[in-house]
Curated annotation (Swiss-Prot):
Belongs to the UPF0285 family. SUPFAM superfamilies: Actin-like ATPase domain (SSF53067). HAMAP family: UPF0285. It comes from the Archaea. Coiled coil: none annotated. This is UPF0285 protein MA_3856. NCBIfam families: methan_mark_12.
Length: 325
């Protein structure tokens, strides 16, 4: 049987296929996907995976914040695309929308994975925040669960930083990108950002997508920053030191929540910055704990694993109810 997971990432749409023991992956840049037609999206899936659309048993989609629903469900039963609003924290390119619509408007069986928000089944104290994490992070967490870990924290560190806590195989809480630890591009609004928004110098969303550690440096993007860090340039290392410090704080805060459930769990680091050895070592030192690392494909692979297990009849994923078929 053939299952596909789709990770709506910050910079790319990543696809993973699971067929028995075989795992295949490919990605489309978000701008690249936005420029394609729905037919071209489906053709790319067929070409890259060497399959026909009719061979796919189930696709698990993630889209944007996923804050308009709280159970995994048939994508065609969603109101709109499963969002409370298209406005929010992040840059809009249209690539995720094109992929979502291509699958929904096809004959492929498909489910949508929700994000975690105030309507989700998490520790009630976390519901002070309206939104906790977008759907693809559940893909990462489910992949870790499939690896055999039931109690863990996973911090996805890249353009932004998002951290989830899982106890006994269920998500109990998460800290979203706009709340605490900054990433390279995105971060929480500080005092000056709030003043800028109030003075109408920028929108809140613009402030969010410019609040990462890149603003501390002369570099234009994540790739340039990481390249400079590899050369030992001080501004780049300071930016990574800052990310590592706040990511460690965020992980520790999730472990504090987990203590109420009798565990602190294994720590996993994911994302393009979480994969950097320099950052990993800093975080491990801050936490005085070893951390395990995941690659950039694990969100999509985890979504494919969700599709596989939902197809087999599973009615709960990480504590999230399944309303399918």
């Amino acid at each position: 049987m053939t299952f596909i997971g789709v990770d709506h990432g910050t910079t790319a749409m990543r696809f993973a296929l699971i067929e028995d023991e075989k795992v295949l992956t490919f990605e489309l840049g978000r701008a690249e996907a936005a420029a394609m037609s729905e037919k071209e999206i489906l053709a790319a899936i067929e070409r890259e995976f060497g399959i026909r659309i009719g061979d796919i048993d189930l696709v698990a989609l993630t889209y944007s914040m996923g804050d308009g629903f709280s159970a995994i469900k048939d994508v065609r039963k969603l109101e709109g695309r499963g969002l409370q609003s298209i406005e929010g924290a992040g840059k809009k390119t249209g690539g995720g929308t094109r992929v979502f619509d291509a699958v929904r408007n096809s004959e492929i069986p498909a489910i949508a994975i929700p994000g975690l928000h105030s309507g989700s089944r998490v520790d009630p104290r976390m519901k002070v925040f309206s939104h906790l994490t977008s759907p693809e992070k559940l893909g990462i967490a489910y992949h870790i669960l499939c690896l055999g870990y039931e109690d863990f924290v996973v911090s996805d560190i890249s353009s932004n930083t998002v951290t989830l806590a899982v106890v006994a195989g269920k998500v109990i809480g998460a800290i979203d990108a706009c709340i605490f630890a900054p990433g390279v591009h995105h971060g929480p609004l500080d005092l000056q950002a709030i003043r800028n928004v109030d003075d109408r110098l920028q929108t809140a969303n613009q402030a969010f997508i410019e609040a990462g550690t890149l603003k501390m440096t002369p570099y234009k993007d994540r790739e340039e920053l990481l390249k400079a860090a590899g050369k030992g340039e001080k501004p780049a290392l300071l930016a990574l030191d800052t990310i590592a410090l706040f990511a460690a704080m965020e992980i520790a805060s999730m472990q504090l929540l987990m203590k109420d459930y009798g565990t602190t769990g294994t720590v996993f680091l994911a994302g393009s910055v979480g994969e950097v050895e320099y950052v990993q070592k800093k975080i491990c030192t801050h936490l005085d704990q070893e951390c395990l690392s995941l690659g950039k494909w694990h969100a999509a692979i985890g979504c494919a694993e969700i599709a596989r297990d939902v197809s087999a009849g599973k009615k709960q994923i990480l504590g999230v109810n399944v309303d399918y078929p």
